[in-house]
């Protein structure tokens, strides 16, 4: 048996981070250390405890001493920096808390550089594109138009990685996530929120007219594409949109959720959000498709998969 790859996942008790961890520990040649401060993460999302090639450490990446202790003790080969303060309402209500994540970016990337990490993977966001100036949104040609603090922080993270590559030769891959959804997502996000409301026959609330268009990427497509980039050494020092190219309006999404849940929910319109609710988000996913090498899971199928496990949306009474 060769030397195990030592992998750090920050934010690994969150939705995407925990699914990534689960996938990476399927390979016994990987040893995964998951860190999370549990401010929004949940230990119930952590992998199977009977597997011996992972461990969890409660740690705040924005606290240098906390994360330095973990990284100095483990000398990681690869780092997935997925920790972030997330959720539309939360990030808009707490802009300074969002900006605090720049400390985590600085800590993780400087420690990675100093400890000769082979490659850093960064969870960026479609938010860096801002209100679209051209569609589909392409990694190379679409200008970035970040305005809200969350988008600015992601843009800062991307700029750090490009600068560190140029100056210190530290390799990276940036994933720009577009509305990933799945069973472990919290109800701070539109898909899980709509499903929670529909399953409880509560009114489904939509900000604005509902004509805003989005694409939704099922978690399995996200994880398969991103882990293939890791395993096969693809898109090094590059940016990859992770999303879907199937657009739907928020109003039509609400109607689809009502149909698939056989709900009695009515749709209720609220005033538009003050900022950050872009009218369209539509990624060019040519690179992602080259990583996935199969058809994406369609929206209806993905929602049905999510409905098969709603334990994080509707907690089971113990």
Locations of regions flagged by a protein language model:
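N-terminal Rossmann-like NAD(P)+-binding domain of SDR-like oxidoreductases, especially those catalyzing
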Residues: 1-180, 309
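Residue-level signal for the nucleotide or nucleotide-sugar donor/cofactor binding architecture
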Residues: 62, 93, 100-103, 148, ...
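Glycine/proline-rich active-site loop of Rossmann-fold NAD(P)-dependent oxidoreductases
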Residues: 155, 180-193, 200-202, 207, ...
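Hydrophobic alpha-helix immediately C-terminal to the catalytic Tyr-X-X-X-Lys motif of short-chain
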Residues: 156, 160, 164, 194, ...
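PAPS/PAP-binding and catalytic site of the sulfotransferase fold
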Residues: 190, 249-261, 302-306
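C-terminal "lid/loop" region of Rossmann-like NAD(P)-dependent oxidoreductases
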Residues: 209, 237-240, 248-254, 262-280
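Non-catalytic, hydrophobic alpha-helical segments
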Residues: 222, 226, 242, 253, ...
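Amphipathic terminal alpha-helices
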Residues: 299-318
């Amino acid at each position: 048996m060769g030397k195990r790859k030592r992998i750090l996942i920050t934010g690994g008790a969150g939705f995407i981070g925990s699914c990534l961890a689960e996938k990476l520990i399927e390979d016994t040649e990987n040893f995964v250390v998951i860190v999370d401060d549990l401010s929004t993460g949940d230990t119930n999302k952590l992998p199977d405890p009977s597997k011996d090639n992972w461990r969890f450490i409660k740690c705040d990446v924005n606290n240098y001493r906390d994360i330095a202790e973990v990284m100095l003790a483990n000398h990681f080969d690869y780092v997935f920096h997925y920790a972030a303060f997330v959720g539309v309402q939360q990030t808009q209500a707490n802009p300074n808390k969002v900006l605090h994540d720049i400390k985590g970016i600085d800590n993780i990337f400087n420690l990675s550089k100093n400890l000769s990490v082979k490659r850093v993977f960064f969870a960026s966001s479609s938010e860096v594109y801002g209100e679209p100036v051209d569609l589909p949104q392409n990694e190379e040609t679409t200008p970035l138009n970040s305005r809200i603090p969350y988008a600015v922080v992601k843009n800062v993270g991307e700029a750090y990685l490009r600068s560190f590559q140029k100056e210190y030769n530290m390799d990276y891959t940036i994933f720009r996530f577009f509305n990933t959804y799945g069973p472990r997502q919290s109800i701070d996000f539109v898909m899980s929120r709509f499903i929670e409301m529909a399953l409880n026959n509560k009114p489904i609330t939509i900000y604005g007219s509902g004509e805003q268009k989005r694409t939704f990427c099922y978690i399995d497509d996200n994880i398969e594409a991103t882990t293939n980039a890791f395993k096969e050494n693809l898109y090094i020092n590059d940016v990859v949109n992770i999303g879907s190219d199937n657009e739907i309006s928020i109003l039509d999404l609400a109607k689809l959720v009502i149909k698939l849940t056989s709900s009695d929910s009515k749709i209720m319109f609220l005033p538009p959000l003050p900022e950050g609710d872009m009218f369209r988000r539509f990624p060019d996913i040519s690179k992602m498709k080259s990583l996935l090498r199969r058809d994406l899971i369609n929206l209806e199928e993905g929602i049905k998969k999510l409905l098969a496990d709603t334990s994080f949306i509707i907690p089971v009474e113990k």
